[in-house]
């Protein structure tokens, strides 16, 4: 079990501790406002079940998840409506349950509820969930989600894989999203919901403690629930044997540290084979937060059973083996779709990604994404049959069915590196950041990819086997709010027949549209 050391004076009703007991696959899910102080600084937040991060939702491969989201939000300084995105799930046949506001649904009104009811027949691994309405998840509505596989091919290589081996990394903001600047700097790195602020005047807050027993092997599931910051992650004195990337099994790859971007996940096996002691867990942010580890910032503690209850004195590896995406290879079905050559696809798209300084907006092919007032899915169900008929104009791309798509995402837009996420799919990264070569044989497969820095031209491939409108966007939430997104309307003619919508979904828009703007 995780052990959290804390001063009760800094905790309001225990709300900043992550719930240790997982919930699901069938559950009510209350979204509430409450005060939390994960770094000793108290603020009002938007919380799932009253805790940050939200509780672990868990189930098994093949489960039917029925998550009844109950909106009890009342704080007018933050959004009162909400939606939830279940990040990484294909939602085949349930596009209406994917969650992005005004793409797949209207928001849930305060005082109302909505049942997300979806099957997970062929996926397992590490996922997460978060609000997908404006920048609401930066105010706290985010948490981990795990689907266990009883036939996991790595099952015999670890002894422990449970609630206690999930590690969340978050950036934390002392100011509510709607009250701050468009591109705020985070105040604190939180590991499993606890951390220390690096600014002058911040209290010395307690750190998360992850307990291990010498001799045991642990499958840790590392989840970036970040709004912006990416993190360089390591555990002093221990190597990380990576076996899963964004809910896809990969060939084992042993490293000392890895960089994880907003929305990404890794599973790694850690063998507790060092002396019984305390070891620093490090998550150094790339942007927005005070970097380094002075005073225990950006840190947590790996504590062996029997070790003294003290902070570690360990040091980082001086020449670490660093994870490179180019070295990751899927365990099965490794080949990229299409022909193993440049242009060997049915449709190739090249996006021009830019930032417009005067407007403080991002653009894809010259267009800033502005959410429509009618969800894209509802537009399709109401008869729109081409991209030209769909709003927002210039931001919807129609994709044919049963086709292989290649998408190039050249870096260079201000504020990078930008992590891009495609809903409804995993994709093959045939050209990762930092590489000038293409790998069609066994490229990493994932659902969030960093597009790197100026000069990079990250290229991905996927098959259109999932009818519906699917969001593609930068997972830095401030950048999404500034228009860094498009919608892929996949196989428009089959959307309605493949994705029958429940009546409660149809009721969402009339209820939302009747709200006063102050209740949004």
UniProtKB/Swiss-Prot annotation:
The keyword Phosphoprotein does not apply. Its EC number is 1.10.3.2. Glycans are attached at residues 75, 352, 402. Disulfide bonds join 106-509, 138-227. One of its GO terms (cellular component) is extracellular region. Residues 1-21 form the signal peptide. Keywords: Copper, Disulfide bond, Glycoprotein, Lignin degradation, Metal-binding, Oxidoreductase, Repeat, Secreted, Signal. Its cofactor is Cu cation. Cu cation 3 binds at residues 132, 423, 473. It is found in: Secreted. SUPFAM superfamilies: Cupredoxins (SSF49503). It comes from the Eukaryota. Lignin degradation and detoxification of lignin-derived products. This is Laccase. It comes from Phlebia radiata (White-rot fungus).
